[in-house]
């Protein structure tokens, strides 16, 4: 499955026009309870130290869905931010609004996307980033996500493209820190 997911990701990035991307070493297809290879932590640290991003957007400690690999990614990104983030850089954790949870989560229960206690919920007024994709931006996002056929085909069958657009239009992040210095 790893080769399939890699091909899908590359297609998705092509749709978005992303020309710079780095793959981490280690397995790319693990089950929901499996940890990622810890070598990834050092790789993320090296990338943050080299790139010195203004902002890092990642999963929160709950992994958004409760999937262990997502929680590992959060830990790695947070540790890299703390160790090598440039002064003034911001760290953001993915979250959902109460409105999203009320409207969308009941519709996706059958897909086991969210484990108990997830997704995290943050009131819209407390978000650090609150972006709602519309029009051409939403169309581009959907085209990019539809390239991930192995992960999204069931949702697309149930919701159709318009319903999927509602499910995926919000990008919500809570402020998780600012690098001092």
Regions found by a protein language model. Give the residues of each.
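Active-site beta-strand->loop->alpha-helix modules in alpha/beta enzyme cores, enriched
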Residues: 1-87, 163-165
